[in-house]
Regions:
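Class I SAM-dependent methyltransferase SAM/SAH-binding core
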Residues: 1-34
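Polytopic alpha-helical membrane proteins, predominantly small-molecule transporters/carriers
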Residues: 1-2, 38, 52, 63, ...
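A short acidic, Gly/Pro-enriched loop at the edge of an enzyme's catalytic core
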Residues: 33-45
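A short SAM/SAH-binding and catalytic strip from SAM-dependent methyltransferases
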Residues: 43-56
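Short, glycine-/aromatic-enriched active-site segment of Class I SAM-dependent methyltransferases
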Residues: 79-100
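Short alpha-helix
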Residues: 100-122
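Conserved Class I S-adenosyl-L-methionine
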Residues: 121-196
Length: 196
């Protein structure tokens, strides 16, 4: 795995070590648009809540396509904007609009195809994610604060505000695709198959 934030990499590696996966998982600090790996290094790849922080989706997906073997599957699970409503900040991935790079699922698909991926399927995960954040918010309110373990550890002291803003954004008519949308594509560079 790769992350731009050194603290996330070191924490992730410690967590892998704690659960006995340290020898099977390697995390690297670096730029996801210029990764330090050889062409065709990976049999598959996935991206989980990354694209909302990277404005240059075309560069990102071209880099992933370079790194995976032909025919490899690439899964994406990101927050994608589907409406024109303004978003209240902070949100889980960004404290301010200038560090947020939300894009539509159409933009993701175009960038994936331009990079050499063929879309296998796209699935709207709005309801799943909305329920998760609503339940997280309810638990935080019921418990009078943060539980011992939870998303607040990664989100910091403003976790309750970020979660509140995501719940509110998801209540807007079709403003966000799921809070997350999953996209699966492969690096075959042949015809496009789409099923939504």
């Amino acid at each position: 795995g790769i992350d731009l934030t050194p603290e996330f990499v070191s924490t992730g590696q410690r967590l892998c070590d704690w659960v006995g996966l340290g020898g099977q998982v390697s995390l690297t600090q670096g730029d996801a648009t210029a990764m330090p790996f050889s062409d065709g290094s990976f049999d598959a790849a996935f991206m989980l809540h990354v694209g909302m922080n990277i404005d240059r989706k075309e560069e990102l997906f071209a880099e992933v396509c370079r790194l995976v073997k032909p025919g490899a599957v690439f899964g994406v699970y990101d927050v994608m904007q589907t409406g024109d409503e303004a978003l209240d900040y902070p949100v889980p991935w960004s404290s301010t609009p200038d560090t947020s790079a939300l894009a539509s699922h159409e933009h993701y698909i175009d960038a994936l195809e331009e990079a050499g991926f063929d879309l296998i399927r796209m699935r709207d995960r709005r309801e799943f994610a909305a329920e998760f954040f609503a339940e997280t918010r309810r638990r935080m309110e019921d418990d009078g604060g943060n539980p011992l373990l939870g998303v607040h550890i990664a989100m910091g002291e403003s976790a309750h505000i970020k979660i509140r803003n995501m719940v509110a954004a998801n209540a807007l008519p079709r403003n966000f695709c799921a809070l997350a949308c999953s996209v699966v594509a492969n690096a075959l560079r042949i015809g496009v198959k789409v099923s939504v």
